[in-house]
Regions:
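Catalytic core of the metallo-beta-lactamase
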Residues: 12-15, 105-164
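Active-site metal-binding loops of divalent metal-dependent hydrolases
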Residues: 27-30, 64, 118-119, 145-148, ...
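Conserved beta-strand hairpin/beta-sheet module of binuclear metal-dependent hydrolase folds
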Residues: 1-49, 127-146, 166
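Pre-active-site segment of Zn-dependent metallo-hydrolases
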Residues: 21-60, 72-76, 150-161
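Active-site HxH/HxHxD metal-binding segment of metal-dependent hydrolases
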Residues: 46-106
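Short, charged, surface-exposed secondary-structure boundary motifs
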Residues: 34-36, 94-98, 108-111, 124-125, ...
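Flexible, charged surface loops at secondary-structure boundaries
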Residues: 1, 17, 51-55, 79-82, ...
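Cap/insert and terminal regions of metallo-dependent hydrolase folds
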Residues: 152-185
Length: 185
C-alpha cells in the first residue's frame, strides 16, 4: 500500500513524502508578500529540527518568484544535503537541473516526476518560467500545480488520463468556478 505524507510550511511550501522519497516543493522563501506568510527565522529554526524537513531527495521550485524561492536558503540546503537533486525553471546554481522544454521527466529510485511548463496565473506573469509536475511513486500519484493559471489546458495535457490521488493547488482552484469545473473533470 502506498504511503503519502504532506507537511506544509508557509505560502505554497510543502514537503511531500511518497513511500521513502522526500520532495521539497516551493519550500524555501523569505520574502513576505501581502496576505501570504513566509519562512522567517523562527520557522527556519523549527524546520531544521523537524524530521519531515530533513534529507530531501528532490528540491523543486515551480518558479523563482521570491514568495516561492530563496537562492540563499536553497544554497544552505544544498550544503546540508549535497545529494539532493535541485530542479528549477531557470539557471541559479552550477549543480541543478534546469527545466526548459515543455515536458521533462526525472526518475529517482522509487519515483518518477513529469514536469510540464505551465502558464503562471495573471497576464502580468506571462513571461515567467513556471512548471508544475505529476509525481508517481508506488502506485500513488500527486499533482503539483504551483501558481498555474486556473483551469489551464496545458495542465490538463500534463495530467492526461493519469488518475490523481493528491493535488496541491492554490485556493482559486477551489474558490473560483473554472477551477472547480476543471477539478470535477
Amino acid at each position: 500500500m502506498p504511503r503519502c505524507t504532506v507537511t506544509l510550511s508557509a505560502n505554497a511550501g510543502a514537503v511531500l513524502e511518497l513511500n521513502l522519497v522526500r520532495i521539497w516543493l516551493d519550500l524555501l522563501h523569505t520574502q513576505k508578500t501581502e496576505n501570504f506568510s513566509t519562512v522567517g527565522p523562527e520557522l527556519q529554526r523549527r524546520m531544521l529540527q523537524c524530521e519531515a524537513f530533513a534529507h530531501p531527495d528532490l528540491i523543486f521550485f515551480t518558479h523563482c518568484h521570491p514568495d516561492h524561492y530563496s537562492r540563499t536558503l536553497t544554497g544552505q540546503a544544498l550544503k546540508l544535503w549535497p545529494d539532493a537533486k535541485l530542479v528549477l525553471p531557470q539557471q541559479e546554481f552550477a549543480r541543478q537541473i534546469t527545466l526548459s522544454r515543455p515536458v521533462e521527466r526525472l526518475d529517482l529510485p522509487g519515483c518518477s516526476v513529469r514536469f510540464g511548463r505551465l502558464p503562471h496565473e495573471g497576464a502580468q506573469y506571462a513571461g515567467v518560467p513556471h512548471y508544475g509536475c505529476v509525481i508517481e511513486a508506488g502506485g500513488f500519484t500527486a499533482l503539483i500545480a504551483g501558481d498555474c493559471e486556473v483551469a489551464s489546458p496545458l495542465l490538463a495535457q500534463l495530467i492526461g488520463d493519469t488518475p490523481i490521488d493528491l493535488a496541491l493547488l492554490d485556493f482559486p482552484w477551489v474558490t473560483l468556478r473554472p477551477g472547480g469545473a476543471f477539478l470535477e473533470r
